Amino acid sequence: MNIHEYQAKEILHKFNVPVPKGFVAMSAEEAETKINQLKSDVLVVKAQIHAGGRGKAGGVKLAKSAEEAQQFVKGMLGITLVTHQTGPNGQQVRRVYIEEGSSIKKEYYLSIVIDPKLSRPAFIFSSEGGMDIEEVAKNFPTKIVKLDIDYAADFASFDSRKLSNIFNLSPEQIEKITNVAKNIYDTFIATDANQIEINPLVETNSGDFIALDAKISFDDNALYRHPEIVELRDYDEEVKEEIEASKHGLSYIKMDGNIGCMVNGAGLAMATMDIIKYYGAEPANFLDVGGGASKETVTEAFKIILSDSNVKGILVNIFGGIMRCDIIASGIVEAAKGMSIKVPLVVRLSGTNFEKGKRILEESGLNIIAADELDEAAQKIVKEVE
């Protein structure tokens, strides 16, 4: 689950991470009533969307007066912001964040994530803040350092000496960066986050370190422990199909292709998307129905897939383990009859009761194209949508 920058800063502030003073506004009138709370010669107006690259897209503006800030607010609210992370359709700006400007001496990058190989937190630090960390890794690989955290030693395992040795930072700078990192780590653990990114972490002319921008994402599997975080969810920032899928226990991610996919198991789903691409087409989605899908779940999955107008064909790829292929086949037939599916439908069943499942499909009287192997199924659906 993702949240807005202003929400991330509110959380970080509670854990004593220094952030600029600011407020959120959902209308120009609201901004006008609150603008006098800020006492700074420079104000920063930021569009609040769940995507990076706002600055290059015109979603971050520097104002030299309250009046100019209000003009930026009026011009920003309601526009559709297109960045490298939003996709071509962009995201509508429904709220803006206005904060006091900071005197910037140097920009750094600091984040904490879960290292998937080690299954433990790791800090990423760079002396090149303010730009995508992927670009830094590509163009300045020597300016990034990874600091692993040992759960047994907790934050005491944060090796600040690496920062000193690699980036030639003073003891005072190291102490302040370490303090910020400690508070970020506390936030990370307490909120069950899976990423906190500060980009940039700025050193001001007075020598202080401030989180000028902040991004936090949380582990969906731990949200039941944090109802206060769930309340921060902004459904306007999420894909409607993904919201609907989550209501039915489905894992769905919308993509830009035209072949809908319904698969059980994340690994098999990714393999299915890969083979579709291998044969020259593009998947329209990732959809994992899980190991305990019912007829009702399959029907909902079809509804979600077909709600995407780009879908020109559907590939169902099921391996029956816990989930029986005959149950899935019955669900497919029931859904196809009830929804009058008009796009080509290729189904590949393998595993528990797959022969029963194939008979159910064959005897349904529906125009369902059967396949025994994934390779065969992919070629058939690609041919159908060409």
Swiss-Prot record:
InterPro entries for the chain: ATP-grasp, ATP-grasp_succ-CoA_synth-type, ATP_grasp_subdomain_1, Succ-CoA_synthase_bsu_CS, SUCC_ACL_C, Succ_CoA_ligase-like_bsu, Succinyl-CoA_synth-like
GO BP annotations listed: succinyl-CoA metabolic process; tricarboxylic acid cycle
Entries under PANTHER family matching the protein: SUCCINATE--COA LIGASE [GDP-FORMING] SUBUNIT BETA, MITOCHONDRIAL, SUCCINYL-COA SYNTHETASE BETA CHAIN
SUPFAM superfamilies cross-referenced by the UniProt entry: Glutathione synthetase ATP-binding domain-like, Succinyl-CoA synthetase domains
Binding site residues for Mg(2+): 199, 213
Annotated binding of ATP, by residue: 46, 53-55, 99, 102, 107
Subunit composition and interactions: Heterotetramer of two alpha and two beta subunits.
PROSITE patterns linked: ATP_GRASP (PS50975), SUCCINYL_COA_LIG_3 (PS01217)
Positions annotated to bind substrate: 264, 321-323
Record-given protein name: Succinate--CoA ligase [ADP-forming] subunit beta
Entry's cofactor comment: Binds 1 Mg(2+) ion per subunit.
Family affiliation: Belongs to the succinate/malate CoA ligase beta subunit family.
NCBIfam families for the chain: PRK00696.1, sucCoAbeta
Pathway: Carbohydrate metabolism; tricarboxylic acid cycle; succinate from succinyl-CoA (ligase route): step 1/1
GO MF annotation terms: ATP binding; magnesium ion binding; succinate-CoA ligase (ADP-forming) activity; succinate-CoA ligase (GDP-forming) activity
UniProt keyword list: ATP-binding, Ligase, Magnesium, Metal-binding, Nucleotide-binding, Tricarboxylic acid cycle
Obligatory cofactor(s): Mg(2+)
Catalytic activity: succinate + ATP + CoA = succinyl-CoA + ADP + phosphate; GTP + succinate + CoA = succinyl-CoA + GDP + phosphate
Domain of life, per lineage: Bacteria
Gene Ontology CC annotations of this record: cytosol; succinate-CoA ligase complex
Organism whose genome encodes this protein: Wolbachia sp. subsp. Brugia malayi (strain TRS)
Organism classification: Bacteria, Pseudomonadati, Pseudomonadota, Alphaproteobacteria, Rickettsiales
